[in-house]
């Protein structure tokens, strides 16, 4: 019974010891002097996102990856690498486990690193400051074997040891040799060697530096590690020294990886009796030796069986939890059938949260009727604009589905590009390319910014909008009516080229369909055509009307939603321009900022085209194909325009002053009380 109890105690001891070795096999070094962050902060989220992708990034880059993610003070810099020759799956597992270990141990430190591995050697390092090319000696971490070289053998041992260390340091820090034999940067500074020692068998050594440092710095880092061993652990039978920029390990047995306890082969028996043989695993400084009597010795097979059973059990539990979690996530983000047809990428919510700083106010670009827009940056450095639809808006969900299906089918230089979407729980996100110069109205209606839009730029903007709408109506696979063309939905890129945005109200027409009706009218007052406002009827000619309003706004620099008095009548911009046309005083319309650098005949021709677009009868309005033709060919004679719709007559209740308004003041009216169902029609390519 006593023997059995002793065996149980020893089993428990070796069970704990085995986990002690496993914990050392993933040693993390957290820098407590570099700074800290709050859990779940933007920096923490960026760190988690970056490290969670490291395994695939490192293997994709042949064993070495150096990158960053985030913006400003929340930016995370990281490096990952494997020893040269590591199989991709082995390298991937090593990086994955090492990164996870750092996340679990370095809970709030802004800097940390870990050299680890059981089948191969790998490194993961992160910081809130760029460290590429800089030698990192601190913080350092070290381990040693508590057993020692016998004093009478020390001199002979040192002669072999010193020569081996010198040779290995020179080999590891020689980038010329390694670069000539390796396609991967991970092998730039790497060396391993074995030297026979007459008393203790073989001395095995592995050294490696990160490839971003110079050969001189690599040599310095490894020499510092050797000096550290000589000063503090000289005479020990094995040492591991870890620094941010280099790895140093030697043992009296051959080994794989960084901290494994597996012997590739047993060292040859010593020629004369020695003290008890060295431990097969490096031990931490407070580890003590256990002397086991013959009658209480437990077999290695029993220990292995216990460890295997426990490890397998833990793995099964973890796998079960992961499967359950993934099933739950799939249920939460299951998409409607119509979204599955979309040709766009579905982003994980955590990716978008990390890219936008968890939708921070600092990254907010603006807000609209159905949500807010944020700037962000993806892991690969791509800048994005994220539209976050309001959680309380029923119309937002309809528009979300509509926009994904519509925009996913479109590819044109004058249409904003949809990169993807995210639909998880209550979050509905649309991810677009980032367009740096905001929208047309930001410049056009600001007296201090309007001077940046000279006539050449404005003419180019009109031409780009024309090509974009023509693509929607005629040249794309689908016939699409935008229904919400306005200055705030025309974005401008870095070169002031226009991109049409916001397809939440867009409708897809059949091949032979020319007109559609809706019982619920939505849109912005002033841009909507008369037939759409009064009868709910829309077609390609509805977009033409909106385009005509845009032309008049671009040339005049005036808002269509403002009121203007002329000849005793109250006019919006469209009817005001018509009166100028009738009075042949079109020069009064031209924005003073472009009068000096434009040809008045050319500008008046553009106004003429704008008036043709806003005619009351849809049949009188030209198609976008015709508009494109007359804009690019000045020799084509234009027909005389007919009066536009929405005349404001000077009668009772028509004077804006009686409503508390003054001439030129914006009414800013929009039809928001009624919601269009925006039913998504079947997508049929032409």
Swiss-Prot record:
It comes from Arabidopsis thaliana. Residues 266-280 have a biased composition (Pro residues). The modification Phosphothreonine is found at residue 524. This is Cysteine-rich receptor-like protein kinase 17. Expressed in the whole plant, but preferentially in young seedlings and rosette leaves. ATP binds at residues 365-373, 387. The lineage of its organism: Eukaryota, Viridiplantae, Streptophyta, Embryophyta, Tracheophyta. Its main location: membrane. One of its GO terms (molecular function) is protein serine kinase activity.
């Amino acid at each position: 019974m006593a023997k059995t109890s002793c065996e149980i105690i020893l089993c428990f001891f070796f069970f704990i010891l085995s986990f002690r070795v496993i914990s050392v096999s993933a040693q993390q070094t957290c820098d407590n002097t570099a700074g800290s962050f709050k859990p779940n902060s933007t920096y923490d989220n960026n760190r988690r996102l970056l490290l969670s992708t490291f395994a695939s990034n490192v293997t994709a880059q042949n064993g070495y990856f150096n990158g960053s993610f985030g913006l400003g003070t929340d930016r995370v810099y990281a490096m990952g690498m494997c020893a040269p020759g590591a199989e991709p799956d082995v390298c991937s597992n090593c990086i994955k486990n090492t990164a996870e270990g750092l996340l679990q141990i370095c809970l709030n430190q802004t800097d940390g690193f870990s050299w680890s591995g059981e089948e191969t050697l790998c490194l993961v390092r992160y910081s809130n400051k760029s460290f590429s090319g800089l030698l990192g000696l601190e913080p350092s971490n070290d381990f040693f074997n508590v057993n020692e070289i016998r004093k009478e053998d020390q001199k002979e041992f040192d002669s072999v040891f010193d020569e081996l260390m010198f040779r290995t340091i020179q080999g590891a820090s020689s980038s010329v040799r390694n670069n000539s034999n390796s396609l991967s940067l991970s092998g730039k500074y790497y060396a391993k060697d074995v030297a026979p020692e007459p008393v203790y068998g073989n001395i095995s050594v592995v050294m490696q530096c990160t490839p971003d440092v110079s050969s001189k710095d690599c040599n310095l880092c490894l020499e510092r590690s050797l000096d550290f061993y000589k000063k503090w652990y000289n005479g020990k039978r094995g040492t591991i020294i870890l620094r941010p920029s280099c790895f140093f390990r030697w043992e009296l047995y051959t080994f794989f990886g960084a901290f494994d306890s597996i012997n590739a082969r047993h060292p040859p028996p010593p020629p004369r009796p020695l003290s008890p043989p060295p431990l097969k695993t490096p031990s931490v400084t407070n580890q003590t030796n256990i002397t086991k009597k013959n009658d209480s010795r437990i077999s290695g097979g029993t220990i292995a069986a216990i460890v295997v059973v426990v490890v397998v059990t833990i793995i099964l539990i973890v796998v079960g939890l992961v499967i359950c979690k993934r099933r739950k996530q799939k249920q939460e983000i299951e998409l409607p059938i119509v979204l599955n047809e979309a040709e766009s990428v579905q982003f994980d919510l955590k990716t978008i949260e990390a890219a936008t700083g968890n939708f921070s106010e600092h990254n907010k670009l603006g807000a609209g009727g159905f949500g807010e827009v944020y700037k962000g940056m993806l892991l690969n450095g791509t800048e994005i604009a994220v539209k976050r639809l309001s959680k309380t808006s029923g119309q937002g969900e309809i528009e979300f589905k509509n926009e994904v299906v519509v925009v996913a089918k479109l590819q044109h230089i004058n249409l904003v590009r949809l990169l993807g979407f995210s639909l998880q729980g209550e979050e509905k996100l649309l991810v677009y390319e980032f367009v740096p110069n905001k929208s047309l109205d930001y410049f056009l209606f600001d007296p201090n910014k309007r001077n940046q839009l000279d006539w050449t730029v404005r003419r180019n903007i009109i031409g780009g909008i024309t090509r974009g709408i023509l693509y929607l109506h005629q040249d794309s696979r689908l016939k699409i009516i935008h229904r919400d063309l306005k200055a705030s939905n025309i974005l401008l890129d870095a070169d002031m080229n226009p991109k049409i945005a916001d397809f939440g109200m867009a409708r897809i027409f059949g091949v032979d369909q020319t007109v559609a009706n809706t019982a619920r009218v939505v849109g912005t007052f002033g841009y909507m055509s008369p037939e759409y406002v009064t009868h709910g009827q829309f077609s390609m000619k509805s977009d033409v009307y909106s385009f005509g309003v845009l032309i008049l706004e671009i040339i005049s620099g005036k808002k269509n939603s403002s009121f203007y008095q002329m000849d005793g009548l109250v006019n919006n911009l469209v009817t005001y321009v018509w009166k100028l046309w009738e009075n042949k005083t079109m020069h009064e319309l031209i924005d003073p900022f472009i009068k000096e650098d434009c040809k008045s005949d050319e500008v008046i021709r553009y106004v003429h085209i704008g008036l043709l677009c806003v005619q009351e009868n849809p049949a009188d309005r030209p198609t976008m194909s015709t508009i494109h033709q007359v804009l690019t060919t000045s020799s084509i004679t234009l027909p005389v325009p007919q009066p536009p719709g929405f005349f404001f007559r000077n009668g009772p209740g028509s004077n804006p002053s009686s409503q508390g308004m003054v001439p030129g003041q914006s009414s800013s009216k929009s039809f928001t009380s009624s919601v269009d169902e925006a039913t998504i029609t079947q997508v049929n390519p032409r």
